[in-house]
Structures are given as C-alpha cells and as structure tokens.
C-alpha cells in the first residue's frame, strides 16, 4: 500500500447509538442527575465487515452527592480507527438546582486525551516523517447545561472546548475540533404498561455537515424496550434492551441505507448498573 497524505488528521468524537442511555459521555451536566450511583460500559464495532473499522469502548460512572445537589463522575473512552487510537480519561462535576417539577444542572469536565498512531504495513515514499509512529497527550475541558423534568430533558454541551494541534514532520496538524451537541427527549405514556420516548441529538463541528440522530423507543412494563433510529436518514438501526433489577443490558444493530450493507453493519452492546447507596438517593426508581 502506498500513501502520500497525512496519517493523522482532525478526529471526530466517537459515535454513540445509545447516547440516551449514557448521556454523560456527551454532556457533563448529566452527572448525578438521577439521584443515584450509576455505572455503565459499552462497546461499539462499526463497519464490522471491514478490517480496521472503527471500534469504541467506553466507561462512565457518576453519583449524586450532598443531598443530590451535586454530581461527580468519571469517563474513560478508547476510540480506534485502523492504526489511529485516541484514549480519553476525565472527571465530571455538576451542580443541580431543583425546582418543584424541573431540575437545572450545570456541568463541567476536565481530563486528558492521548492521540497515538502506529502505521504498520504501509509503504511510504521517501520515508515521510508524517507517517512515523506518533503519541501525544493533550489536556481538554468541557461544559454542559441540562433542563430535566419528570417527562422531558433538554441539554446543550461542548464536551471538549479546546481545539488540539500537534507538530509532525515540521508541520502543524489540527487533530481535534470542538463538537457542539443539542439533546432532547420526551416520555409519552400510551397506557399503564406502554411508554413511548422519542429522542433527538444534533451534533455540529466545523468543517462537517450537521449530524442529526432521531430515536423512537417503546418500553413495556418499564422493563423491556424496542426502538428504531436513523442518523442523517442514511443510517438505520434497531435497539433492544431489558432491565433486570438494578441492571440494564442493551444491544443496537445498524445498517447504512445505501452501499454494501452487509460489509458496513455496526454492533453496539451496553451494560449499566444503578444503585441507591446513600440515604438521600432515590429509592423508588432505578433512573433507567
């Protein structure tokens, strides 16, 4: 294989089909919002029929503190595309203002991202230094706001406020540009046993078109969920999940609307735990 362009270019944030299950990954204001201890992990394999396709592993945990007025948590994400790997570690903090029916939350996060690449099996003309193995760690910080009621939530966030550039082969290369997220969801009670929850996620970054996710989920007996979603009307998916006591398990299958669908399918699995470990925590609902 012969290449003649840079191996490391501006990176996108990882995609999350189950963003509504782990919203703190995109908005720190969700830390502690359900007045419980929460821990979740997920694995995503994108374009599973393609060698070197994107894979993402993430963990996030957060807890409500000080009579549920504060939330604190942590995030760990590893995102890999071919030989390019980004690893993020960070902490989150949120302050909650609780009204009678609405909670306002203001969140911040800070941490480090390690950008690395190890180009192997690539024939490079003239030993281009841009293709040498690379590793650099950058600090970043982000903010988010959230308004949440009994049936709805609306959030706006910039998880990483700082753009990042590195010097490679005597050239300055931008490796990250800010992403802006707008999230909304509403819960409809169709009957005592059936709930309908549509959610939307808008993602905007400089140099890329607006990305829009729309999900429509049905939940039965507050335990079993099935849903459909689309991203930009060119990717479609199916979601199923179930709650077993304080544990929730979920699975997503995605297909592109055009092209070689069998080669570009995507799988995403998740597991979450919700506990009431403090006397001030919500003892009547898991928050799922």
State each model region's role.
Residues 4-5:
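N-terminal signal peptide c-region/cleavage motif recognized by signal peptidases
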Residues 11-288:
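Subset of outer-membrane beta-barrel
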């Amino acid at each position: 294989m012969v290449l003649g362009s840079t191996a490391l270019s501006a990176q996108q944030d990882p995609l999350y089909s189950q963003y509504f299950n782990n919203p703190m990954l995109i908005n720190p204001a969700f830390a502690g919002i359900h007045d419980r201890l929460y821990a979740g992990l997920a694995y995503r394999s994108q374009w599973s029929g393609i060698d070197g396709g994107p894979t993402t592993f993430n963990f996030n945990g957060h807890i409500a503190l000080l009579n549920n007025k504060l939330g604190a948590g942590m995030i760990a994400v590893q995102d890999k595309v071919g030989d390019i790997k980004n690893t993020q570690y960070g902490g989150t903090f949120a302050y909650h203002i609780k009204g009678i029916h609405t909670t306002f939350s203001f969140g911040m996060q800070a941490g480090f991202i390690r950008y690395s690449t190890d180009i192997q099996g690539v024939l490079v003309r003239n030993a281009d230094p841009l293709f040498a193995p690379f590793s650099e760690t950058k600090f970043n910080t982000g903010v988010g706001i959230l308004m949440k009621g009994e049936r709805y939530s609306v959030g706006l966030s910039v998880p990483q406020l700082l753009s990042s550039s590195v010097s490679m082969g005597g050239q300055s290369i931008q490796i990250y540009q800010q992403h802006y997220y707008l999230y909304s969801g509403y819960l409809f009670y169709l009957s005592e046993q059936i709930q309908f929850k549509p959610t939307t996620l808008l993602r905007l970054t400089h140099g890329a078109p607006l990305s829009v996710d729309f999900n429509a989920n049905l939940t039965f007996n507050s335990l079993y969920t099935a849903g459909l979603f689309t991203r930009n009307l060119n990717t479609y998916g199916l979601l199923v999940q179930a709650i077993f006591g304080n544990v929730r398990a979920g699975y997503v299958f995605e297909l592109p609307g055009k092209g070689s669908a069998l080669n570009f399918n995507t799988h995403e699995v998740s597991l979450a735990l919700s506990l009431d470990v403090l006397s001030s925590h919500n003892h009547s609902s898991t928050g799922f």
